[in-house]
Structure formats: C-alpha cells, structure tokens
Amino acid sequence: MKKRLLAVLLAGAMVLSITACGSSKDSSKSTTEAAKKEETTTITLAAAASLEKCYTEKLIPMFEKENKGIKVEGSYDSSGKLQSQIENGMAADVFMSAATQQMNNLVKEKYISKGDVVELLENKVVLIVPKKGNAKVSSFQDITKADTIALGDPKSVPAGAYAQEIFTNLKNWNDVKKKASFGTNVTEVLNWVAKGSAECGIVYATDAASSKDVKVLTEAPADSLKTPVIYPVAALKKSKNKDAADKFVKFLQSE
C-alpha cells in the first residue's frame, strides 16, 4: 500500500499543480453554505512540510467532502520543529512526520500511543536542479561541482539528516557541507532551487513532483541511505477531538 499511496501523492502533486485553481470558487461557496447548516468539528494536523501541497490541494478536500462535519486545519514545518511545538503545548490532533525519529520521541514522551502509530508512506530522496539552465552536476557523487547546494538543516529537518547520511556514506559530506546552505524545512530548500538561488538541492520525490520549476536528476544511490524514508502518522493522546482525529488517520490509510 505504501508504494500505491506514494504514486497517488506524486500523481496528485503533478496534476493539481495545473488544475487546482479551476473550480475552487464554486466548491468553496458550497462548502461554506454546508458548514452553516451543521456544527463543525475542527482538528489540527501537524505535518511535514514536504506534504503540504498534497494535503491542502487533495487529501484534506477529499476527507472534508466525505466527512461534512469535520474540518482539518494544517500546520506544516520541519518534523523537528513540529515535535518541539507539540512538546511546548501545540494543540495538535494528528501528527505526521517525515521520519520515524520525531514520532518515536513523542511516543517515548507519552504524547502518542505506540499502538496508534501507522507507517503510512515511504518516500524517496532525490537530487534536483532548476528546470531552466545547464546543471554542473549529474549525481550525488559529483554534487560538489556546484557552487551552492541547498539542504535541510540535519539537526531539525529529516530530509537534511537523510542527505547527511547519504553523503557520509559516499565519503563526500565534508566537502558538501562547505558549499551548503541549510534550510529550515524541505519546502524552503525546494524554493531555493526553483528560484535559482541554489544550483542544486536534496529533497523528497513528492516535493520535486509538486514544482514545475525543478527537475530531478537522480535518486539517492542504492545502499547510500540505510534508513528507510518512512512517514508515520498518529492521533495524539490529548486530542480534544480524538474520534475525528482517528477518523482522519483511518481515511489516510484507505486505498
């Protein structure tokens, strides 16, 4: 199921980047009118920045259409930042991180029940360059041919931690970090490359698919990344709308 879900997210990101603006006015009007007729439960989703487009343009509208009495509000950032926000009192109902570490930390700290965690999605780490222009680089191995490399901060951004692991295993991390600019989340990295502020960058496949201004050169080499890129999701124990939160998590698991 993970591979099918990844395919849906990738396809959705590419299609929606072109078609999402087409019918927003009518659907928004009908949604507003329906909301007036019934009470609405609002849940807060804290999710990795790499999933923002998939959620806002496809998954949340689909869920709200099927569950008229539930509204989902999203908060998107690096998984490390979201973990800290939850620990500091953020009233999140559902958490979806771009790595297992942040989810495991919240399980250990009793914010989430281990049995509620679902490994929902497996992503890929890719090397991107601006769509326009001639790239100096062609692979993870020769990335230091670029003068500016965009990466997520390994301390708080899972995509950055994955990049560090990849380049460490390829024996070129020390050279890479000398040319790296570190973003606060993976979306910032994507935007730097899309705008040409960086010659190349490391993001997830879902991010690359969501932008028409970048192109993927290659996936991370086999065996360079020992840690699977897993996106776990779970409802938080202290959610004030646990039934609605559980319903949303179950929806995400459906095919």
Role assignments for model-derived ranges:
Residues S113-D116, P221:
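Short, P/G- and charge-enriched loop/turn segments at secondary-structure junctions
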Residues G69, A91-A92, A198:
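Short, high-confidence coil segments that cap the C-terminus of an alpha-helix
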Residues G74-Q83, A92-L106:
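Ligand-binding clamshell of periplasmic/extracellular solute-binding protein-like
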Residues N67-E73:
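A generic structural motif
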Residues M90-A91, K114:
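Short glycine-enriched, charge-decorated loop/helix-capping segments at active-site entrances
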Residues M1-S24:
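Sec-dependent N-terminal signal peptides of Gram-positive bacterial secreted proteins and lipoproteins
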Residues C21-K65, G80, E87, A99-T100, ...:
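Exported/periplasmic ABC-transporter solute-binding proteins
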Residues D116-V125:
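Short, glycine-/small- and polar/acidic-enriched structural segments
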